[in-house]
Structure formats: structure tokens, C-alpha cells
Design a protein with these regions (language model features):
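Short, hydrophobic/aromatic-rich beta-strand segments within well-structured domains
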Residues: 12-16, 105-107, 118
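Asparagine-centered polar/low-complexity signal
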Residues: 95, 110-113
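Histidine- and aromatic-rich ligand-binding microenvironments
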Residues: 83, 114-117, 129
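Regulatory, non-catalytic segments
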Residues: 101-106, 110-111
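Basic nucleic-acid-binding alpha-helical/helix-turn surface characteristic of O6-alkylguanine DNA
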Residues: 1-101, 147, 151-156
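Short Lys/Arg-enriched helix C-cap and helix-to-coil transition segments
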Residues: 117-124
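…primarily DNA-binding HTH/wHTH and HhH modules…
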Residues: 128-156
Length: 156
């Protein structure tokens, strides 16, 4: 496994990869020897463009290779359908994947999304309009939603 790190407005981002991207996550510090391969630079540049408000979608999604159950992968695929600047609820996602009673399981799968920003789990909020959980905290989630045009008062 190779790793690349870069600093961003939301913190240090780590990309784990081999031939494909395995994980994109926020970390507290850079640890170990970092690589600088083409695949890393491809995603690093897209993420930085997004964080600067210059990109609304991502290219080369076929290079994402998540490890997870079929159920988790179906949830992550559904997340990719949530448009930039829009939100969805856990209930709507459960309906989208044909499992309307599986809201909690959907929430768990959303929380295990291995691809920060690229697979937009930050766009999922509670049905009542509350922000809901986020693996990297509500401040990061709010910041990502602000980039997409949400105002603080539009999210509870």
C-alpha cells in the first residue's frame, strides 16, 4: 500500500492507494514515507479544486476501489447520486437503495464511507434538517456544505 499526504483548508488529507484508490481520509499528522504518484496527484488536485470552490464533480471515479460489504457499496453508490449543493436524508438514501426500513444501517454505512469528499457523505443530513453525524466532526461537515452554498441557518 502506498500513501500520499497533503495539507488542505480542512486539515491533512491522506490518500491510500495501490493501482486504485483505497481510502481518502483526514488524519492528525503525516506519518511514514509519502509517495507522489500520478494517481495521487490526480485526486489531490481535484480535492483542492473542490475545497477552493472551483470543482463540483470528480473525474476518474472508476479508480476508487473500496473495501466493504455489498450493502455498504450500494449506499456509497447512492451517495454519488446526491448532486452538488443538495442534501439527502438517511431515509431518502434507504429508499434509493430499495431498503426503506434500513435507515440505521444506511447511517452506519455512510459513516464508514472510505472516500472523504469524493463520495459525498457530508451531503447526508437528518430528515428533520439537523446536521447529523460525520466521521470528522460537525465543523468539517458544515465547512464542506458551505463550500457547496449552504448557509449556517439552512442546516440546523
Amino acid at each position: 500500500m502506498k500513501y500520499g499526504y497533503f495539507k488542505s483548508p480542512i486539515g491533512i488529507i491522506k490518500i491510500s492507494y495501490e493501482e486504485n484508490i483505497k481510502k481518502i481520509e483526514l488524519v492528525d499528522e503525516i506519518s511514514g514515507k509519502a509517495s507522489n504518484d500520478k494517481i495521487l496527484l490526480l485526486f489531490k488536485n481535484q480535492i483542492l479544486e473542490y475545497l477552493a470552490g472551483e470543482r463540483k464533480s470528480f473525474d476518474h471515479l472508476e479508480l476508487l476501489n473500496p473495501e466493504g460489504t455489498d450493502f455498504q457499496k450500494s449506499v456509497w453508490q447512492a451517495l454519488l447520486k446526491i448532486p452538488y449543493g443538495k442534501t439527502s436524508s438517511y431515509k431518502e438514501l434507504a429508499n434509493e437503495i430499495g431498503k426503506p426500513k434500513a435507515m440505521r444501517a444506511v447511517g452506519t454505512a455512510v459513516g464508514k464511507n472510505p472516500f472523504l469528499i469524493i463520495v459525498p457523505c457530508h451531503r447526508v443530513i437528518k430528515s428533520d434538517g439537523n446536521l447529523g453525524g460525520f466521521a470528522y466532526g460537525s465543523k468539517v461537515k458544515r465547512n464542506l456544505l458551505k463550500i457547496e452554498g449552504f448557509k449556517n441557518q439552512s442546516i440546523k
